[in-house]
Amino acid sequence: MNILVTGAKGMVGTALCNNLKNIRDGKNKTHPALDIKEIYEYDLDSTPAELDEYCQKADFVFNLAGVNRPENPEDFMKGNFGFASDLLNCLKKHNNKATIMLSSSIQATLAGRFGNSEYGRSKKAGEELFFQYAQETGAKVAVYRFVNLMGHSRPKYNSAVSTFCWAVANDEPFTVNDRSTELELLYIDDLVEGMFDLLEGKEQHCEFDGVETVLKADGRYCCVPVTHKVTLGEIVDLLQEFKAQPTTLMMPKMPDGSFAKKLYSLYLTYLPTDKFKYALKMNVDNRGSFTELVHTADCGQVSINISKPGITKGQHWHNSKWELFIVVAGHGLIQERNINTGETVEFEVSGDKIEAVHMIPGWTHNIINLSETENLVTVMTCNEIFNPNHPDTFFEPV
């Protein structure tokens, strides 16, 4: 399959081309049915001759080209409708009935606040041109009316989310005029997966009730139904949590598929390189060090413990707190004793064979570095964040 992507250097085009190449080059094996040979990338710096060649050879076309911030309103029609006409005429010239996808906009509904949108009118005209082309040629046409897109793009240009991410990550001032303003957002990775579905003939169809997407198996339009409705206030509050994470160590809740998970990934792409690395507080004494790495609201914390040669650490027990000790370097011994029955167990542990050992509530425990020359490095997970007002930790030698 040869694929033409117009607008290949835009936000969507860049992400789509990168991921199409992953499939073509065998780096992404999750879509075995897709056999991609060539990816033709067309953008503003391409030539008419290249477009002519690509339209002759393409088996599938993603038309992402268009304008959304022209200097003059009339340029909307020229940039969105005009290029669409050129593309379809070029395909007709070569009698190429390749499937073609059109990136349109929710503004093309011309409903609600979009009623007077010049951009929406130009997109609507492009849609009708594509539907007419499908009737005339019999080619499959897939028209997507995208909501606000969420991906790495130029800040202070066309995306409030990108602007907020950039501002928070770079300590720049920003203004939220109305925290209650709601956006419907489509994340770039979800969009790309939707395009893979289209390539495989598994796209979802819809109609529109005003600006609301209504799934319908025989709908005129196609859609990627995985969107998120969030307020500006919710977005900036999450971003402030992300910014504070290196200091608080608290990782915000980010369930699989959640908006927070996607926003955090996007936020990180705006970090300046001098923020890629940040210091952690090492609690150092003559025995070694103890450093907390990550806190979570639901699952406690993760830490790194370093014990110098011959050192014993621990010698305490907990009522309800529990831990996992995972030695990743060095050679050590973990001992535990039930404070009620006196039963004892011990485990020899080594970074050469990584194992996890439970520290059981009601069992006093320690960890001993058996080496005379090497540090013992242990990852320690705990089911709760340390609370000095309720430490649940009691000294008791094993």
What do these predicted ranges mean?
Residues 44-82, 86, 90-93, 107-114:
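NAD(P)H-binding glycine-rich loop region in Rossmannoid oxidoreductase-like domains
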Residues 197, 201-282:
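Mid/C-terminal beta-alpha module of Rossmann-like enzyme folds, strongest
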Residues 341-343, 368-398:
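Double-stranded beta-helix
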Residues 1-26:
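N-terminal Rossmann NAD(P)H-binding glycine-rich loop of SDR-like oxidoreductase domains
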